[in-house]
UniProtKB/Swiss-Prot annotation:
Descriptive protein name: Acyl-CoA thioesterase 2
First-tier enzyme category under EC: hydrolase
Gene Ontology cellular-component annotations: cytosol
InterPro entries xref list: Acyl-CoA_hotdog, Acyl_CoA_thio, HotDog_dom_sf, TesB_ACOT8-like_N, TesB_C
Binding partners and assembly: Homotetramer.
One biological process term in Gene Ontology: fatty acid catabolic process
Species this chain originates from: Haemophilus influenzae (strain ATCC 51907 / DSM 11121 / KW20 / Rd)
Active site: 204 (charge relay system), 228 (charge relay system), 278 (charge relay system)
Length: 286
């Protein structure tokens, strides 16, 4: 396992304060605001420690209420909303400086068999047909001041191969879609809880940025303001992030200063393992 991946997994293992209260450290990615994927993943990690052991996370819905500060830890307060025979619903409040910055609901289910069908994975090419995203980020890093250049050029916990590379500081006009192959940068434990938290973390990277593609904008371009409003994930099938997965994202709408993006995550053999959806603020001022 790479050091950077080991650090991320450690970040997602929270300190237990009492039965329903947990503390997580924050990750500095070069921005003052804490990364939303970190908050969702840590909130799910907290919920998993409270949910009954025989139940598996199958969906979560997060509302981001205020920006988090990447220089301070976050407290996660878990509440059980309902405990049924087969399902458990939990709510997690992410708290920083006594303010709730994110509200996450998560549902867990006892595994069972039932009807099966799924969408077909789009035929967009193999991972080796796509460009290594880190190559573009390292080139961008050369043009940035410290400490941002160091963060952009740093090793990442995921290997990512992306179809459309959009410079975050100088966007180009692209289709309202994105296809990204990804896997962990190093061997990952097969523990389903770790796998689901890692997927939740990664799923926040490309979603809402796809809504900028038709408008020739990068998310760090002068005059742009981009912020996630809500983020949802449905976990369908077991998966192993040690192998390549495809996140196929489409933005079907932008209106009123908001953009919407919907994604499907497939294993390389075509199994639909998760669905994602995100709405965010996308505002541009001259």
């Amino acid at each position: 396992m790479s050091d950077i991946l080991n650090n991320l997994i450690h970040l997602l293992k929270l300190e237990k304060i009492d039965d329903l209260i947990f503390r997580g450290e924050s990750q500095d990615l070069g921005f003052r605001q804490v990364f939303g994927g970190q908050v969702v993943a840590q909130a799910l990690s907290a919920a998993m420690q409270v949910a009954p052991e025989d139940r598996i996370l199958h969906s979560c819905h997060a509302y981001f209420l205020a920006p988090g500060d990447s220089q301070y830890p976050i407290i996660y307060d878990v509440e059980t909303l309902r405990e049924g025979r087969n399902f458990s619903a939990l709510c997690v409040k992410a708290i920083q400086h006594k303010n709730t910055i994110c509200h996450v609901t998560a549902s867990f289910q006892v595994p069972e068999k039932g009807f099966e069908h799924q969408n077909t994975m789009p035929n967009v090419g193999a991972p080796e047909d796509f460009t290594d995203e880190n190559v573009m980020l390292q080139k961008v890093a050369q043009t940035l001041p410290e400490p941002l250049n160091e963060k952009f050029a740093a090793e990442r916990p995921f290997e990512v191969r992306t179809k459309y590379l959009n410079n975050p500081f100088n966007g180009t006009k692209l289709p309202a879609e994105q296809y990204s192959w990804f896997k962990t940068n190093g061997e990952t434990p097969l523990d389903i809880k770790i796998q689901q938290c890692l997927l939740a973390y990664f799923s926040d990277f490309h979603c809402i940025l796809t809504a900028l593609h038709p408008h020739e904008k990068g998310f760090l371009q002068k005059g742009m303001k981009v912020a996630t409003i809500d983020h949802s994930i449905w976990f369908h099938r077991p998966f192993d992030l040690n192998h390549w997965h495809l996140h196929a994202i489409e933005s079907n709408n932008a209106f009123g200063g908001r953009g919407l993006a919907q994604g499907q995550i497939f294993s390389q053999d075509g199994q639909l393992i998760a669905t994602t959806q995100q709405e965010g603020l996308i505002r541009f001022s001259e």
